[in-house]
């Protein structure tokens, strides 16, 4: 399970590296409950993080906890409606040319999607 402390630590490291490192943009694609895949969010992450941490961040940042997920500062909303469901098992994350699917509780387990 993704720890909130780790997310806060990653965010603080990101702030420290922001001036010297360019950010990487990853995409969250909802396809678990839709007729066709839809990119719902772009998320800026530190490129030095592992794919695993980037995926954990993508899952946490696209789930509503205390506030709607699209209001997170790291998230660029890509859906046309006023609201959008939270990410779920079966949804995907695109990191460069690598696509992963959330396939466990709270995104803790990931699977590489074949091209």
Which residues fall in each region the model found?
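N-terminal disorder-to-order initiation segments that are Gly/Lys/Arg-biased
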Residues: 2-56
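Catalytic phosphate/metal-binding cores of nucleic-acid and nucleotide-processing enzymes, i.e., regions
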Residues: 12, 35-37, 68, 98-103
